[in-house]
Amino acid sequence: MGQMVEFEKNGVKVRGYIATPKWAGPAVLVFHEWWGLESPLSNIKEICDKLADEGFVAFAPDFYKGQYADNPDDAGKLMTEMFEKRMDEVDRIFQASVEFVKECRYTYPKKVGITGFCCGGTLAMYFAAKFPEMVDASLPFYGLPQLTQINAENIKVPIFFILAEKDEFVNNDEVIDIAKTVWKNGVDVQVKVFSGVTHAFLNEKREDVYDPKRACEAWELAVNFFKTYLK
């Protein structure tokens, strides 16, 4: 089990959840869904714990700074405010988080992967494009590219897009177009569309959409991806 922590880097205050492995390992930043890190509907802390069990230092920054939602209306408001008004602050939180995990005594080698779910998947695309020098691999789960500008031509690191066939929020064709742009630049790109499932199918706290079989398959792919490019 991990724990909530707070720290300050270069004047940027960050709070988040960290889980560490038994021995040293590379780091993975995990970006929360529109619910927020502390929401009872979020499984991001559990994702961090599972990554630690696989040998990674996992840190989930709280981009909502303690706020969270337990219903779609409030979640939408928090997410929209973040993408429309707070992206400069979100950038600084990300940069501080990278520094934090690289300085962690459990992090070795000093490599950093990023992943996220829902709007966190959007951020996993966005940061890979905006800060390619700070990222070693990216794995967005059903990210929504329409939420912010994704400069796909700037993505220089291996990236794996995991999508849901029946996702009512994500236009999978738009994500695949991003993947094609990255591939044309000679970057290692993978895309997996899981059939018969919808948005958030990995979230065991959402019984209405959770698919244990597909979730297990997707998780195995994710772990193998990070072990390939970070270790």
Curated annotation (Swiss-Prot):
InterPro entries: AB_hydrolase_fold, Dienelactn_hydro, Dienelactone_hydrolase-like. Its EC number is 3.1.1.45. Keywords: Hydrolase. GO terms for molecular function: carboxymethylenebutenolidase activity. The active site is at residues 118, 167, 199. It comes from the Bacteria. Coiled coil: none annotated. It catalyses: 2-(5-oxo-2,5-dihydrofuran-2-ylidene)acetate + H2O = 4-oxohex-2-enedioate + H(+). It is an enzyme of class 3 (hydrolase). The keyword Acetylation does not apply. Pfam families: DLH. The keyword Cytoplasm does not apply. Belongs to the dienelactone hydrolase family. PANTHER family: ALPHA_BETA-HYDROLASES SUPERFAMILY PROTEIN (PTHR46623:SF6), CARBOXYMETHYLENEBUTENOLIDASE-RELATED (PTHR46623). This is Putative carboxymethylenebutenolidase.
